[in-house]
Amino acid sequence: EQLLLVQQPGFWNKKPMFYSYDRNPRCTAYIPYNCGRAYVSGGLNGGTSAAFLAMCKELDRRTEQDIRNGVVPLWHDESQLNRYAAEHPGSYRLLPPTYWYPEGWQMPFEQKIIVRNKSRYFDVAAVKHHSQHTRSWLQCKWEAFCENYLP
C-alpha cells in the first residue's frame, strides 16, 4: 500500500455496476462494467513520493493521449484516478468517506474532513467558463451568510 485514496461518498453504499466510471472504450479512463471494486474521489489522495509521482506521470500520459484523440473522460481526473485504482488493486489504502465528507450531507460516518460547497464561496460556472455572469466577492459572502445564518 504505497498510495492513499478515499472512497467517493456518493457511492459508498452502491454496487460497482452503478459507479459512474467512464464507460467510453475510446477513453484511457475506460472501465468495463465487470471491473473495478471501489469508486475513489479525485479530491484527496497521496502516498509515498515515488508511488505518487509514478501515478501522476501515468495519469498525465493518459490525459495527453486522450487530448490527442479528442476524448475527455467523464469525470476528468477522477475518472483517470479510478482507472488507475482499478488496474492497481492492493497498491493503495482506501480510506472511508469519513475523510471526504461533503458539507450538508447526512451519512452514517463521523466527519473527519468536511468538503466545503465551493459554490458558496465563488461562481463555479464562471470559473469553468460556462457563464459570462460572475458574482462579486460580496455577493458570494452574502449568499453564504444567508444560507448559514438566516432562517
Give a label for each model feature:
Residues 137-151:
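Juxtamembrane luminal stem/stalk of type II transmembrane Golgi/ER carbohydrate-processing enzymes
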Residues 27-125:
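Catalytic core and acceptor-binding pocket of nucleotide-sugar-dependent glycosyltransferases
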